[in-house]
Amino acid sequence: MQEPPVYPPPYKPPEMKVFYFLAFVFGLVIVISLSIYYYTEMLWFESVGYENVFLTYLKHSLGFFFLEFIIFFVPLFLTNVAVRKVTLEFHGEPLKIPHLADFGIAFFAALTVKNYWSSMLFYFNSSNFGVSDPIFGIDAAFYTFQLPFLKIVIGSLLAALLISLAIAAFAYMYAFRWVKSLEEFKEIFPGSGFMHFSALLFASFLLSAALIYLSRFEIVHSEHGLISGASYVDVNILSPSLMFLSAIVLLSGIFAAYIVARRRVERVFQIVGVLFVIAILLTFVAPFFVQKFVVEPSELSYEGRYIAYSINYTLFAYNLHDVKLQKFDYWDVVNYNDILEAKDTIDNIRIWDHRPIRDVFRQLQQIRTYYVIQDVDVDRYRINDSYVQLLLAARELSTENLPSRAQTWLNKHLIYTHGYGIVASPVNKVSKEGLPEFYIYDIPPEGLIKIERPEIYYGELTDDYVVVNTLQEEFDYPKGDVNFFTKYAGDGGIKLDYFRKVLFSFRFGDINLILSNYITDESRLMMHRDIVERVSTIMPFFVYDDDPYVAVIDGEIWWIIDAYSVLQNFPYSAEVRGFNYMQNPVKVFVNAYNGSVRFYVVQEDAYVRALEKALPGVFLKDMPEEFRKHIRYPRDYFEVQAHIYSTYHMKDVTAFYNREDVWAVAKEKYEDDVIEVEPYYVTLAIEDKPEFILMLPMTPVNRDNMIAWMAARCDEKYGELIIYEFPKGELIYGPMQIEARIDQDSELSKLFTLWNQAGSRVIRGNLLVVPINHSVLYVEPVYLRGESAKIPELRLVIVVQDEELATGTNLYEALENLFKGEKPAEKPATPEKPSETVEEKLEILREYYSKLVDAAKNGDWETFGEMLKKIGEVLGYEGE
């Protein structure tokens, strides 16, 4: 009688006590670290008045993490239990996979998707757009707020099941490693094990079918060469194919579960192979052939309705559906009276570009090496009853610029805590030396705008924590050889006690917070001082403009940041920079002294309404008038809109298909490069009243003549977009054509050459297109920078109107030269006129240059030096 075979027992894991202890210690360290981080973060949220926001985030982030943890842990745990049961049934003792492994895999799997917690917040607080997609008739909120969360949850479940399936397969392979063939395995493997595999397979097929079914909704925001959104093939071939494929996968799951339960495991691989082939045929081959042989020969007739969908939904997604179209009745000639009538416009034409004036500000107004002027911004103010555009820059403090020996912990965190004041100049004023006039200047700040709180504790360069209200006074500002000190008098920051000092020492890895004798219970710790990081910590759901600008409001310095609603899956909308929906619903104000943050809604959309549901009381509707005076239409957003509108202004399907009237942003020459014109702010009388607008000239694609200009209003009718179209049959010069005319002007060419030969570098600034009455004025500033000097000087302003070109040392002189011979009834107030015209200076320079060359040839170096000095005097340089 043959004895039954003796099978080896399953693997017994070694004692895990040491491992468990180390895992416990590791877990404890993580828990303590996270607890310290979240508690100190809660203290910060409490200090800025957003404690409820933090608690909402904590609830949703932890809720989402635990949801994902459960999604992964339950299948893994049940699989582990099943493996133990099956191996116990066969061997008499179980194969024990530690449950800590289930916990660890689930924990780290949940960590990988934890940053998607906002999808749950939007899912449960979804708000309708009021716009339904034309294919399925579902509100756009389903695609933007609900579908992403459903896909994450179902995808996580499927991933958990596939991991469980793989673990079960490897566990059983190990437990039955002595089996020599599949037939032997099928014969001896317990039926409960096949049922385990059967259940896992069916659940995996079921979830795969669900994901395939949901994927059909994604066709409405797919990208094609022709349009954005579902095309004819997507709607009529791909969508039905995906439904059919989903049903096939579900039926295959039932069949696979049945045959595995009947011990025919090898059939599963055949089923998967057949499904793969069917999927290729349904989702790639069939759509390709229909597109190639049915649609493309008559593409417009098939795709026309879908092109119309793409146009309409794209315009809605970028807030371009209410653009006002106006004809610009172009007249060739502007006379001097037109200039006089447009005095507010002329007085605010920007002849100082932000790059040259930033260099001027840095050289003349940084005052000390540790102060930094990071950027220059444009805003408008009412000064002496005049509407004035100003260029403003904050004077921030960077401890990195302190001498290396002064970069101590005390200096960086307790003494040098804040910047001081701002610098401001009008956009079109220039001194005799070619430098800007200052309306706010020096330390303490002086000028036409009063600043009562010039300290800047929060800004663009404040990227480290500081402690204020300590026993050590803070450096306030220098005055001559004397340094003035101060104590913080605001309510910004987190009040410290000993316990909090310990917590923040752990958080920052800085023991000095505990050891320093200067820090008391009245001290306040300021962190998240970088303004963009600060607002994104409070409200991480927006994309923030990377160019915050500074404003003086009621004597205080405020930062203003534009917040954008950005989505990637809006139906039928064109994609730009990785997204296909962009709005600017919120303006954020940050106080530079106390760090207070306010979120004001200026143009509500569904994205903000969803956040208002989740975070009641955070978004403010009633913006104070003093704040409203300083909001402006953001340039980055305007650039995106212009890019979209350049194509999607063609609402006629045939014209869009043929690309008959595609526009482009006009190009200009800046220094030696050809670049796209950047949107710029001008003061124009849109409705017989001067107002602050953002504008951009447009040209036909691959051509240089102007076809239209786009304007965004910033004052009373904030956010209104207007397109002014020029007459189709007339040639209106674009910026590059004006640049070419300037290049071809022989007198200017000689002057530029002479300046370059005299040791200076000519910098041609931005060419501005300024609509005046029914014509266009072109203005380009020209700067000089000496080889050794870092300060650019404005030396020339070029103005062009129709066929006329004129220059002057300032805008008013250039305009007088442009309209010389005309006798206006009155004359705009102008700066003191230089004694010599440009033409006279050119003649003098030619004479001096000729004598300089002759002296060099004859070796008369005394005369050479004298002539070189005189050339420098004519150009505005004095001294040797």
Curated annotation (Swiss-Prot):
Subcellular location: Cell membrane
Major subcellular site: membrane
Pfam families in the cross-refs: UPF0182
Keyword Translocase: no
Keywords recorded for this protein, A-Z: Cell membrane, Membrane, Transmembrane, Transmembrane helix
Membrane topology: Multi-pass membrane protein
Family annotation (InterPro entries): UPF0182
Transmembrane feature ranges: 19-41, 61-83, 103-125, 152-174, 195-217, 237-259, 268-290
GO cellular component, one term: plasma membrane
Membership in a protein family: Belongs to the UPF0182 family.
HAMAP family for this protein: UPF0182
Name assigned to this protein: UPF0182 protein AF_1421
